[in-house]
């Protein structure tokens, strides 16, 4: 998969969000935005896809301990923190 910056503008998650709103994004694209950037040879979209393949969907991701995310290549502390915060915000909105 090419780097996100090499994709056509209408296929880049951030640009798509700005143009069409967050509801237009797939789960993979939402996660890619949280991940921010990939590693050499692996885009944020690919890392997001790896997470979704491992945990099936966003709901599957939501219940996991932070250290479990480290199984995915390139998912380190800073990326895990962003994902955990997003789920915590969603939980607080939903349950309070």
Predicted segment positions?
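Long, highly charged, low-complexity intrinsically disordered interaction regions
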Residues: 1-69
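Basic, amphipathic DNA-recognition helix from helix-turn-helix-like DNA-binding domains
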Residues: 85, 89-96
């Amino acid at each position: 998969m090419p780097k996100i910056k090499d994709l056509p503008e209408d296929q880049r998650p951030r640009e798509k969000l700005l143009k069409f709103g967050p509801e237009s994004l797939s789960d993979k694209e939402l996660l890619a935005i949280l991940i921010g950037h990939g590693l050499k040879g692996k885009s944020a979209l690919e890392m997001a896809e790896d997470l979704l393949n491992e945990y099936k969907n966003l709901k599957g991701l939501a219940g996991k301990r932070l250290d479990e995310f480290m199984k995915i290549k390139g998912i380190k502390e800073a990326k895990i923190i962003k994902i955990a915060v997003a789920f915590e915000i969603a939980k607080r909105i939903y349950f309070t």
